[in-house]
Amino acid sequence: VSKDLNILAENRDALLLAEVAAWLHDMGKCRDEHIQMHAYDKTDNQSYDYKKHYASILNNKDFLDQEIKSKQKLDDKIYFVLVKDLIEKGKPNSLKIPEDNILIKLLGRCHAAAHIEKEEAKDEKTLKAEINKKNDLDKLIQKKKNAIVKKRTTINELEKKGIGDSSKINKLKDEIGSIENEILEFQKNADAISFKLRQVLQSKDNTWISTPFGYEYEKIENLNSRLKNIPFDKVNDRKEIIKSIQEAFVHALGETRRPTNEITLDDWSGIVAALYKSSLAGLLIEGESELDPRCLKWRFLSVRFNSEDIWGNSSSIPILLARKEWMETSLDNLKHLLEETYPLGNEVYRDENGSVFVVPYIEESEFNKALKDLIIEKMPYDGEIQVTPTVQDKSWCGQYYNYKKHPEKNEVPPISSIISGDIPSISANPNDVENWWKGKRCSICTVSHLRPADSRSSNRNISDYWLKKVTGRAKKWKEQKESTIWIDEVADLNGKICLLVGKLEISGWLKEDGYIKTLPFKSPDKDGDYKKFTKEQSFARISRVWRTTKKFWEEVKTNDLDKYRINKRIKVFAEFKPEESNKLQINNSYEAVSEDDIRFTIFYSGNNEYIIIENLELIAKKIKSKYRDTDKKAHELIKEYSRGRNIKIYDPNGKKRDKPLGSLQVSDVISEDANYVPVIPILAEPSIFMAIVPADKALDISRAIKKKYEEEMGKVRNRLPLTLGMVFAKSHTPISSIMDAGRRMLKNTSKEQRWEVKKSIEDKDPCTSNNKFHTLKFENGIEWKVPVTMRGGQIKDIWYPYFYIVEKEDEKPNGREKSFKGPDGWLVHASEIEDGDILRILPSTFDFEFLDSSSRRFEVYYDDDGKRWDKIKASRPYFLEDLDEFDKIWDTISNALSISQIKNIMHLLEAKREFWSVGVNDQVFQNYASDVLSNANWKKKPQDNDFAQVVDAAVSGKLKDIIELYMSVLKISENGQNDDGGI
């Protein structure tokens, strides 16, 4: 290890404590009083300073007096500072104080560099003036009301004495009327100011956290208790204290005012801490006592590789998950190396293809080489992957220290170029591969495809190295069993699974002058430079984008799939009788075959105990097909069937898969309580989601994702497209083929389209959540309900729901108050879209494919327009909104036509389509399709609109896909529908 890096290890404790102090430098914002102080309805006598009063409720304040101190002198100086001073003084204005400690100045600079940008601060004087004006008006109104009370009292006294001069009383009444008119005018002005303030300031009892896409999802409450629960006596235990800080700060805000209420205190503090830690590391390495904090710069260090090369060719789910865990463990090791062992910086981004760290800007090439060598040494992936760390050439300062005078010098952290850049393929270390094979003559390991399959303790072609990892993964499952890693447990009643894939295209939000610059922080100036009134692309805000999208997929993985829980598993007690000298390996799965050829999958957990790892309903269906129907529950039927039987055991992944290893003599079968979701999550990263789900649940889950997307991203859906894909297959289809098809779907990126508005409608009535919408009906049949208010429906959203408009790109749109010229043309607010407008849309789509064979995956291929290359499937992918239409059309035909009728209609239509070589807008074929459907023997003919929808679907080819999906893939027609034949 180089001397430069050793100095970081020597100062580890000081660096990690400084990092914790940076995490806590704005801890005063995690207080209920802070929310109340910045509300429009705060009480007049309320006083709270988050930099002074933050610790008043804490039970333990000793940590504030801890000293952060360098181990050695740097240019004859020992650097030290108290945690308390960092928290209270580490602000951007510390740069203006000559005598301030450089450690405090560095934190102030890092605070500014990562800044939320406080865009509203540019109008801070105006806002304060409005607040003062409102207060003055309130006082004046009260003064006038007091004057009225006084005059009315005088009138009452005069009238009681009976000596009132009518002229005097009338004069007083006239004065009261005049004052009341003044009050009305003052109140009108005060109400107007209140309305403006409420557009920005939130209520003390109703302050919400927003996503960067304008969805307000959490009401802030109980901050004091959250802050008090942080274990401040553990500030020297980095892992525990930061975890506790994050758990508290994720419920607080860096800024409460709209529309900058999208950065949580967790997002904000984490970025400041990362910058501060790396700046101190740079100070130690460079040893510059004359360092000017204003000139601080940073770089990104990344380790990127194509993860698909690691787990994409896995032959089973346990192998896939073991490979994925192996990859992630090495990234965790890298994180520990750079964050704790040699505290150089922090991981600020991770996805399926690696990690990105923020590190100090150090020009010395020898240091950077030593750093790369250390990373290669510490995360070698045991020779299977050669890691290539990259220190980005471009340095950046974030927000320029004097940004008010020189905003052009702000530098957006160029992380998007890393994330969206080419991902290097992986390669093994040839020397290691050569050593593995010395003196070996055997098959190749089917897990790594590199090592020799030298395991003597397994019947499978696997190396000892990977046997331990794969069986170790299964052992972990056996100990918990709160989830599943077995494909057959996921399969539906028809033995089918679905790989559900999804992608949120966030690259446009991360790049310079990207979609963040389409979000105003105040009413846009139509004639002004968009850079002056749109949000800044601060590090904190960019970070918030990928954290939000990652959270979206994580919530899909947990919340949306939770309702499919299974509550029973079956355990079999049996004695294994081997054929030849075969053995069963503990923590392995095998195929069990009964005398009457009922097959299912079991897991050997040791001590003659086996667990059935297959959908119990599917096994029961197999049993019922050979015997009479029964009303018994699946687990009861299987127990009754299995007791006392002799069951042959096969290893489908073994070297002799066609020969039985032996047999099980079953002595007892019991059912166990279980609590697992039959879903195997694979990826839930910022821009990508993969999970294996039961085939018959895939559409329900897709609809739930669509609903969640429309609710949470509805204001920016034209700029943040969602891609969904469903790859259906039988449960024993090679998982590598299924994964390949899913990856192919995700490679199809959304292409910008131009949609003409048929009808723009302002919805008068709010929905059940009181939010208000603006409906856009497009000529292509798509309908969007765009949210145009913030949470609760009382505050108009003037910040998020904007659309790029085509026909007015080069000229100012007439009569559109809420419009401005953005980075790539004119943007108009959803509420001001008019009939006939042409909008630029990045559409969301969904696609599906059934792999009846592994080679079918090659048909998932797209042309330059994003459509399937295969002419038969050229209608795919469909707009995401068509998911609802698929359901509606299927309901229309399945409830009124028999299975045979549907099949016969499709045969007539598709045969004629092929024979006539039907093109686009073929009126003859349109008439033919209408006639065929009209002449069908409907049980009840659909309404005209529904019938027209079915005809249009038949002409476009959509009906063929709907029938394939529902009848051929999902087998919905097998649910006992009567079949009377005919057309």
Role assignments for model-derived ranges:
Residues 1-983:
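Regulatory and interdomain segments flanking nucleotide-handling catalytic cores
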